[in-house]
Amino acid sequence: MVVNFKIFKKASPNNMVTLYMNRREFVDSVTQVEPVDGIVVLDDEYIRQNRKIFVQLICNFRYGREDDEMIGLRFQKELILVSQPVYPEQKIDIQLTKMQERLLKKLGSNAYPFILEMPPSSPASVVLQQKANDSTQPCGVQYFVKVFAGENDCDRSHRRSTVNLGIRKVQYAPTKTGIQPCTVVRKDFLLSPGELELEVTLDRQLYYHGEKISINICVRNNSNKVVKKIKAMVQQGIDVVLFQNGQFRNTIAFAESSEGCPLNPGSSLQKIMYLVPNLAANCDRAGIAVEGDVKHKNTSLASTTLIASQEARDAFGIIVSYAVKVKLFLGALGGELCAELPFILMHPKPSLKAQPEAETEEA
C-alpha cells in the first residue's frame, strides 16, 4: 500500500538552508498541543564551514496599527517560545515521527530533524481583518517556524540565510456537546400590572462554520406595552487580553421581523428565526476576527477560543466568543427587552485521509 502525502518546502534566499514540514496546522486540545516537527536540509558548503544552525518557534503578537508606529515605539511583540540547535547535532534523543523517518531517508545525510513543544497556554492563531486596500501587517497572533544561521540562538539573523514559515495553532470542536442553551428574561414597567417575558432557545450549543443557527423565540406579553418588532443577531466577542478595556463586539449576522407584530397586551407569539454567520457577508469589514492567515489557505471566521480556565489566558492573546442576541422593540417610550445566549462556533476535526497524490508545495 502506497501512502501519499503533501510536504511544505521553503528555502532561504541564498538556498543554503531549506525547511521541510508535512503540515502547517497544529491542534490544541486545551490541555496539550501537538508538537511542531520538521526537517532542515543544509547545503554542503554550510556543512564544511561547520555553521551553527538554530530553529525557533516564534509567536508574533501585533496589538496596534503599523501606520501609528513612531520612532522607538512599536505595537508588536515577537516572542521566542522555543529555541533549539539543529546543527551541529546535539546528543539528545528525539522521538521521530514516521513522516520524519521517511523524509530523512529521502533527503540524505544533510537532513536534520527537529521537534518543538508548543506551550499549551500559548494563544490561538487569530488576526483582525483589515480593509481591502490595507497592505500593513494585521493585528493579532501569528506563528512562525524560523531557521537561521548564527553564532548562538540570540544572534541577529541575516535575511539571506533565514527561513520563516508561517504555521497555525488551531482548535477543533469537542466531541462532547453541552446542554441545549435556553434563557428567559422578564421586564416589568412602571404603572403596568404585568410583565413582558422573552424566552430564547437554540437547537444545540455547538455549531460548525457555515451551519444554520435555529433561534426559537417565544414572547408572552402580560404587560400593557406593544411589541413593534423583533431583531435577532449573531455577535462575535473579541477580548484583547493585554488591554483592560480591550473587549468589543461585532454583529456578523442579523435578521429583523415584524411578522406577528404589533404584539398587543395579553397576546403571545412563538416563531423561529434562522441566521448563518460567515465571513463572506463580512469580507469588507475591518475588525472582524478571522483565523490566522497562512499562505495558500482559505480563511474563515475565527473559531471560539477554548481555554482551561480564566487564569490560563495568555496576556499576548485574543479570546474569541460568540452569542445570539434577541431584541424586542417596544417603541420610543417603551424601550427594549434583550436576551442573550452564548454558543460555540468551530470547525469539526478533519478525518485522517491520505492525499490523492504526493506533492511538495513551495511555501
From Swiss-Prot:
Pfam families: Arrestin_C, Arrestin_N. GO terms for cellular component: cytoplasm. GO terms for molecular function: G protein-coupled receptor binding. One of its GO terms (biological process) is visual perception. Keywords: Sensory transduction, Vision. Belongs to the arrestin family. PANTHER family: ARRESTIN (PTHR11792), PHOSRESTIN-2 (PTHR11792:SF16). This is Phosrestin-2. It comes from Calliphora vicina (Blue blowfly).
